[in-house]
Structure formats: C-alpha cells, structure tokens
C-alpha cells in the first residue's frame, strides 16, 4: 500500500521548483479562475514557514498590503502555482519566522545574503 501511494505521488511532484528557505523573498505566480477565465495573480512577500514533505509540503508567504499583514499558505506541488521566483535570499537563524508578525517597519527587515 505504501509503495502504491509513493508511486502515485511521484508523478504529481513538481521538478522545476527553485530552492528557497524561510527568510527569502518570493514572487509566486498563482493561477486564479474567475468564471470561465483564468488569469495569473502575483503574490510577493517573505517566506515565514516551510513545512511537511513530499506531496503535502507547504510554505507560507507574508506581505504587508496597505498597512495590513497578509499571509498566504501554498502547497508546493499544486498545479495552481504557475511559477515561483526568488527575488532575495535572506539570512535568518530560525526555521519559523512567526516573530515577524509583531514587528513593523525597519525592524521587520531581513538581512540579505550576498
């Protein structure tokens, strides 16, 4: 049974993903279906969490939109994601950056890896 599940999920995994970690700034191209039309919507922000493995792996991206913090969680291998771009590599010492939720302005900045 376990082998059957592994074979099925193997075909669903994406192979064209860039490597990214918490602290990196991403631009996620998401396919949005509105009625019969399909368009690409961009979501740009900092990765605050990456969890799971295999087909069930997810990551959470946080951005500030009009002064309000917005977090969106994406499955890594979903067909709804058209493309993931890594804009900046951030240097952080934690795997989960939940502390960014309480920081505002310049305190919420992350150092960039050169």
Curated annotation (Swiss-Prot):
Stored Gene3D superfamilies: 2.30.30.790
Superkingdom classification of source: Bacteria
Keyword terms: Ribonucleoprotein, Ribosomal protein
GO molecular function terms attached to this record: structural constituent of ribosome
Keyword Oxidoreductase attached: no
InterPro entries on file: Ribosomal_bL19, Ribosomal_bL19_CS, Ribosomal_bL19_sf, Translation_prot_SH3-like_sf
GO biological process, one term: translation
Presence of keyword Transmembrane: no
GO CC terms in record: cytosolic large ribosomal subunit
Function: This protein is located at the 30S-50S ribosomal subunit interface and may play a role in the structure and function of the aminoacyl-tRNA binding site.
Record-stated family: Belongs to the bacterial ribosomal protein bL19 family.
Protein name (database record): Large ribosomal subunit protein bL19
Source organism of this protein record: Bacillus cereus (strain ATCC 14579 / DSM 31 / CCUG 7414 / JCM 2152 / NBRC 15305 / NCIMB 9373 / NCTC 2599 / NRRL B-3711)
Taxonomic lineage: Bacteria, Bacillati, Bacillota, Bacilli, Bacillales
């Amino acid at each position: 049974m376990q082998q059957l599940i592994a074979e099925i999920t193997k075909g669903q995994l994406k192979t064209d993903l860039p490597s990214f970690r918490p602290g990196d700034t991403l631009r996620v191209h998401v396919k949005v279906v509105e009625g019969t039309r399909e368009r690409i919507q961009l979501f740009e922000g900092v990765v605050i969490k990456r969890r799971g493995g295999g087909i069930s792996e997810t990551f959470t991206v946080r951005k500030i939109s009009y002064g309000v913090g917005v977090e969106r969680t994406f499955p890594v291998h979903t067909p709804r994601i058209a493309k993931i771009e890594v804009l900046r590599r951030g240097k952080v010492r934690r795997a989960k950056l939940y502390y960014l939720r309480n920081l505002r302005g310049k305190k919420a900045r992350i150092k960039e890896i050169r």
